[in-house]
């Protein structure tokens, strides 16, 4: 069994796309998989309760499929920072509670388990703890999703430094092209783009698990399978 914590350089860096893509890739190889999203805001009200699209995407790529409450125990409606959403809801998570909750899913020892954070590495869980503390408590290697956009070199390097400062290994990183301006319609643009990737490869000092381009796939499931085509599982890089 291998478990990783997935974080990103920013809120919309592409954590769920990459995590679901890695799970889809593992399933292609016949491996058992599990994706967890312990804390999520921006959830929608359904007849079955609050549901988060990112958590549902991870659930769809988990095999065997777990109950929703297993992978997303703290679901909040407001699309704001999780600790603020939790305060509004009057249901504030703690690291002790999260560690206790993930104990049973992790005990299943699936071939690949990914725990996706919220936002970036330093996003607060509550007034006193960061969500990154879950990875620290569980001593998990980290996969960093780098949103490829202007400023990503600084964001990526600071994130990697913070992860290592917390005593955790950076198992790998994935570049996700989120800025449509980073196209290579001109030769000069492509050269700059390639230089950015080379700088990330040199300075992050961790394996690159793939570069995901902008995908045309419409549904989360289709996007997960499309992303899988550009990814490598940790340990294979």
From Swiss-Prot:
Substrate binds at residue 41. It comes from Chromohalobacter salexigens (strain ATCC BAA-138 / DSM 3043 / CIP 106854 / NCIMB 13768 / 1H11). It is found in: Cytoplasm. Homodimer. Catalyzes a mechanistically unusual reaction, the ATP-dependent insertion of CO2 between the N7 and N8 nitrogen atoms of 7,8-diaminopelargonic acid (DAPA, also called 7,8-diammoniononanoate) to form a ureido ring. ATP binds at residues 12-17, 54, 116-119, 213-215. It catalyses: (7R,8S)-7,8-diammoniononanoate + CO2 + ATP = (4R,5S)-dethiobiotin + ADP + phosphate + 3 H(+). This is ATP-dependent dethiobiotin synthetase BioD. It is an enzyme of class 6 (ligase). The gene is bioD.
